[in-house]
Amino acid sequence: PNYAYGKDAVAAFKKALLALKPDVEFIAEQWPAVFKIDAGAEVQAIERAKPDAIYNVTFGPDLAKFVREGTTRGLFEGRTTYGLLSGEPEYLDPLKDEAPEGWIVTGYPWYDFKSGPNKDFVDSYQARWDNHPGIGSLVGYMTVQSVVAVLEKAGSTDSEAIRVAFADLGVETPVGPITFRAIDHQSTMGAFVGKTTLRDGGGVMVDWSYKKGSDYLPSDAEVMKLRPGN
């Protein structure tokens, strides 16, 4: 979508992919206004470009329209399609039996956890709310956990004390231990990555794995380069 999130997501993807595969060529881009996508026109434009693969960052109702039009017109056939956020229950569930097959996505496969902290969180959430968690539920819970942890470490609600306490703050979460890095206070929470498929009339993630943020975040040297004045 044509706003900061979409622009940043595409820029980051291009940078990372070019670092891994310098000869890759980006042959077309479509920038629909957020929640105002003309999916038919967008799909036609992409099809005319004949890409080998597609990187999609639309979500919500835009994603539903794009998937429907793209499937109807055969856009995704024979093409690897990547969908940022497309495996998150908030966006995958509404697609129901129209969910795409074989997209590589980030998401939250709450239905496949068999044991451990992830399973414990899902069970507790379902018992409390009589519904399954989404990625927003997980992030919200981890945010509260982090606030509690930093207040306990700081021993104060003073802003400076909290700032200092966030450096190398460790938190035990449903996805495992995370740390807020000293250099930028960025958490090392990672992402679940897998492929979409249909199961029981709805979309799910399969062949997924959890990628630790610490394995992918910018190095200290890169962080310093990005800071104004450096």
Tell me the role of every PLM-derived stretch:
Residues 1-73, 111-116, 120:
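Extracellular/periplasmic Venus flytrap/periplasmic-binding protein
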Residues 134-142, 175-182:
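Short catalytic/ligand-gating loop segments at beta-alpha or beta-beta junctions
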Residues 170, 174-230:
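Solvent-exposed, acidic/polar segments of extracytosolic/periplasmic ligand-binding ectodomains
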Residues 64, 141-145, 160, 187-188:
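A structural signal for well-ordered alpha-helical segments within the folded catalytic domains
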Residues 158-175:
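Short, well-structured alpha-helical segments that form the helix of a local strand-helix-strand
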Residues 69-141, 152-157, 205-229:
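Extracellular/periplasmic periplasmic-binding protein-like sensory domains
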Residues 1-13, 89-93, 138-144:
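Extracytoplasmic ligand-binding site segments that recognize negatively charged/polar headgroups
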